[in-house]
Amino acid sequence: MSRNELFDVTVIGGGPAGLYSAFYSGLRGMKAKIIEYQPMLGGKVHVYPEKMIWDVGGLTPISGAKLIEQLVQQGLTFHPEVLLNEKVESIARNEEGLFELHTAASGVHLSKTVIVAVGGGILNPQKLQIEGAERFEVSNLNYTVKSLQHFKDKTVIVSGGGNSAVDWANELEPVAKKVYLAYRKDALSGHEAQVDQLLNSSVSCFFHTEITKLIASEDHEVIERVELTNAQTGEVMELPVDEVVINHGYERDTSLLENSRLDVTRVDDYYIAGTSNCQSSVPGLYAAGDIVHYEGKLHLIAGAFQDAANAVNSAKRFIDPEAHKSAMVSSHNEVFKERNRELVKKMFV
């Protein structure tokens, strides 16, 4: 399809909120497009593919990877156009009242409405500030834990003390040979239950301590030891390790709204201030998922689904004020008639 083709709705972001927005747009007969910055759909769930997710209504415990698979399958039900590896750099409105989405790779995309579903935004991990550290990113310097199996029977040090660092240390503890955690402050700042679990486990913690040097193997290909320095005592020690995991927080890319020629009201200089129907301060522009802020907002995947449906319904009524307030429920929706016939056949084969 041509990028200048007009769409009813363009969804920025291909995570849970974006994928459900695409699905629900199809349910409402809207021509939809998803533009995703990453090379794959699924959003932040990719950060924890092996973790079990318990709080999606109607689903028994499911791994992040499996949830992504199902979200993508559902999101593509009505064949929205999908663009991957595309960053929307700004949003504007032309003289005809149409939205123009400017992307780095393919120029301008036209849409009657827009749903911003970028979650926490484009998050870049804060890198370890040690000269030459980047060369170990292809070997054993990690900024995420994608596979627990990768760390099986290894000695691992986690640097950081926030929610993700504590969570990773807890996840690795029963899998790895030994887990250490180094944190520059005197107390961990993760969730209380997770911190208690960590402090009562076999994980060895070094407080007031930072990684100050990476010591390479003889071939200089992997980290063999780390130098730890205690900021209070000045004590320096070396620790043999197989893997180094860094979680020092993330740098959030806020350029999308900052570069846009639209008066979008924001909260805390990032989140889009919205209504319970996910309407922003700009008519025709909506937000769903973690990016939107309103009273009573639920920051769960389940909440993202409701946001997505509300945003799509609002977009539909923006285009056609006479349209129904919501889509017909799927169990009685004619759009699924033939699909249901095929599914029923398979059930009784």
Curated annotation (Swiss-Prot):
Binding site for FAD: 36, 44, 48, 88, 123, 290, 331
Family indicated by similarity: Belongs to the ferredoxin--NADP reductase type 2 family.
Species lineage: Bacteria, Bacillati, Bacillota, Bacilli, Bacillales
Molecular function as annotated in GO: ferredoxin-NADP+ reductase activity; flavin adenine dinucleotide binding; NADP binding
Record's protein name: Ferredoxin--NADP reductase 1
Class of this enzyme: oxidoreductase
Quaternary context: Homodimer.
E.C. designation(s): 1.18.1.2
InterPro entries documented for this protein: FAD/NAD-bd_sf (IPR036188), FAD/NAD-binding_dom (IPR023753), Fd--NADP_Rdtase_type_2 (IPR022890), Ferredoxin-NADP_redctase_2 (IPR050097)
Cofactor binding, per record: Binds 1 FAD per subunit.
Top-level taxon of origin: Bacteria
